[in-house]
């Protein structure tokens, strides 16, 4: 029987998993410096969690959800995005209570699942990095979230990215805009795509996100939400924009930006990368916004919230083109070679001691001939080769060779007890 991975999935092998680890660690370090803490939620939830949060008319729910009935008759779905599960955890664990400092800031790095057409940077099992902040309705919470996304892309070395930003206002604004869109699209309903005709009666905002060719002729003249904003929404949006101006963050006010999920309210944003070697037009790598009613939707108290998500597959595609130096294999610090009776266990001890000091170290578990051990040291990219023979073992010494220039050093076993002392002797 030939076993293959399912369509739309990939094996992240050791030769590339280190690249993923580096990207994720960069994100973790940045989020922790901003006092965000990791949260881990189940990879599957009750179907209603996602159908209610994402919207029954969203592509995610209508076309892309992996859902099934389990053996207990429960309607279950694999998570298609990260926010809904985090909100459910926030409510179920009563994190809205006084025992938790607000805003409550978390991040996650996890696998998601959507039934999409597999293509470069997009798979049916994909990985997402995200942040969520609960409890503050202040404009600086929006600014902070946008800055985290901006700074992460900068730290990773992403080039030619641009912030697109818009606001959806509050529920009253959205209702007025909803009615305006219905009035605009109804006379041309028969000329719209099948999906947009269906959405017109449920959520016409989704039409603005349509990629269907037959819809494009109507989108440019569609009503703009900025014309329906109340004074409070305008003032809040202008505060966010003014803050970004003062902080030197460039942006484009994008009237067509609506985001693909129904739970967004207030400010929404996307970071788009313009790279002709990857895509014909600028493409989104990070997106998010404010969702002030989702906690209430899941029977929690009124709680403002804001967050964003990044698709790792697409991000990795960008970095492989724009910052390949980030993914260069750094090799290991030490490879311990040994020959002679009694040197095998000492080689193990030396490797463990070096690891305890924070170095990466490997020895030859196959105990091959010395020449073969040196070849392996070269193949794994060792910076230093430690040679341990019967003579060195008897004298309590080690010979260390720096492969970059061939310089050799003689060390005592006791030199391995202190990292600073060791470095002073081999980095001359």
Swiss-Prot record:
<dbReference type="GO" id="GO:0016740">
    <property type="term" value="F:transferase activity"/>
</dbReference>
<dbReference type="InterPro" id="IPR033656">
    <property type="entry name" value="HisRS_anticodon"/>
</dbReference>
<comment type="subunit">
    <text>Homodimer.</text>
</comment>
<dbReference type="InterPro" id="IPR006195">
    <property type="entry name" value="aa-tRNA-synth_II"/>
</dbReference>
<dbReference type="Pfam" id="PF03129">
    <property type="entry name" value="HGTP_anticodon"/>
</dbReference>
<keyword id="KW-0963">Cytoplasm</keyword>
<dbReference type="GO" id="GO:0140096">
    <property type="term" value="F:catalytic activity, acting on a protein"/>
</dbReference>
<dbReference type="InterPro" id="IPR004516">
    <property type="entry name" value="HisRS/HisZ"/>
</dbReference>
<dbReference type="GO" id="GO:0006427">
    <property type="term" value="P:histidyl-tRNA aminoacylation"/>
</dbReference>
<comment type="similarity">
    <text>Belongs to the class-II aminoacyl-tRNA synthetase family.</text>
</comment>
<keyword id="KW-0436">Ligase</keyword>
<dbReference type="InterPro" id="IPR041715">
    <property type="entry name" value="HisRS-like_core"/>
</dbReference>
<keyword id="KW-0030">Aminoacyl-tRNA synthetase</keyword>
<dbReference type="Pfam" id="PF13393">
    <property type="entry name" value="tRNA-synt_His"/>
</dbReference>
<keyword id="KW-0067">ATP-binding</keyword>
<dbReference type="InterPro" id="IPR036621">
    <property type="entry name" value="Anticodon-bd_dom_sf"/>
</dbReference>
<dbReference type="InterPro" id="IPR004154">
    <property type="entry name" value="Anticodon-bd"/>
</dbReference>
<protein>
    <recommendedName>
        <fullName>Histidine--tRNA ligase</fullName>
        <ecNumber>6.1.1.21</ecNumber>
    </recommendedName>
</protein>
<dbReference type="InterPro" id="IPR015807">
    <property type="entry name" value="His-tRNA-ligase"/>
</dbReference>
<dbReference type="GO" id="GO:0005524">
    <property type="term" value="F:ATP binding"/>
</dbReference>
<dbReference type="InterPro" id="IPR045864">
    <property type="entry name" value="aa-tRNA-synth_II/BPL/LPL"/>
</dbReference>
<dbReference type="GO" id="GO:0004821">
    <property type="term" value="F:histidine-tRNA ligase activity"/>
</dbReference>
<keyword id="KW-0648">Protein biosynthesis</keyword>
<dbReference type="GO" id="GO:0005737">
    <property type="term" value="C:cytoplasm"/>
</dbReference>
<keyword id="KW-0547">Nucleotide-binding</keyword>
């Amino acid at each position: 029987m030939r076993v293959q991975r399912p369509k739309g999935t990939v094996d992240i092998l050791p030769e590339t998993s280190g690249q993923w680890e580096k990207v994720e660690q960069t994100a973790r370090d940045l989020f922790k410096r901003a006092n965000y803490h990791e949260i881990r939620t189940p990879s599957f939830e009750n179907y209603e969690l996602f159908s209610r949060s994402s919207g029954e008319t969203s592509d995610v729910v209508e076309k892309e959800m992996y859902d099934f009935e389990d053996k207990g008759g429960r309607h279950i779905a694999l998570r298609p995005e990260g926010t809904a599960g985090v909100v459910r955890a926030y409510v179920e664990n009563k994190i809205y209570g006084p025992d938790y400092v607000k805003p409550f800031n978390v991040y996650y790095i996890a696998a998601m699942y959507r039934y999409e057409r597999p293509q470069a940077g997009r798979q049916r099992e994909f990985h997402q990095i995200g942040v969520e902040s609960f409890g503050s309705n202040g404009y600086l919470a929006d600014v902070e979230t946008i800055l985290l996304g901006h700074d992460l892309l900068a730290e990773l070395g992403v080039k030619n990215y641009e912030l697109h930003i818009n606001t959806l206002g509050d529920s009253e604004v959205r209702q007025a805009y909803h009615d305006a869109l219905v009035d605009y699209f109804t006379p041309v309903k028969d000329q719209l795509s099948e999906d947009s005709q269906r959405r017109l009666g449920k959520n016409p905002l989704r039409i603005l996100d349509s990629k269907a060719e037959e819809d494009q002729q109507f989108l440019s003249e569609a009503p703009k939400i900025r014309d329906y904003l109340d004074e409070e929404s305008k003032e809040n949006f202008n505060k966010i924009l003014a803050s970004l101006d003062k902080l030197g963050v460039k942006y484009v006010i994008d009237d067509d930006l609506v985001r693909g999920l129904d739970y967004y309210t207030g400010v929404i944003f996307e970071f788009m990368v313009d790279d002709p070697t990857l895509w014909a037009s600028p493409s989104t790598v990070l997106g998010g916004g404010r969702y002030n009613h989702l906690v209430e939707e899941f029977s929690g108290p009124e709680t403002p919230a804001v967050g964003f998500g990044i698709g790792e597959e697409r991000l990795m595609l960008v970095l492989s083109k724009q910052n390949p130096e980030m993914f260069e294999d750094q090799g290991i610090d030490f490879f311990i070679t040994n020959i002679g009776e009694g040197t095998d266990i000492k080689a193990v001890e030396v490797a463990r001691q070096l690891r305890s000091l924070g170095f990466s170290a490997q020895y030859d578990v196959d105990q091959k001939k010395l020449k073969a051990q040196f070849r392996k040291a070269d193949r794994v990219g060792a910076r230093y080769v430690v040679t341990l023979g019967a003579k060195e073992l008897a004298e309590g010494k080690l010979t260390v060779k720096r492969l970059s220039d061939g310089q050799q050093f003689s060390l005592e076993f006791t030199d391995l007890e202190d990292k600073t002392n060791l470095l002073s002797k081999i980095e001359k």
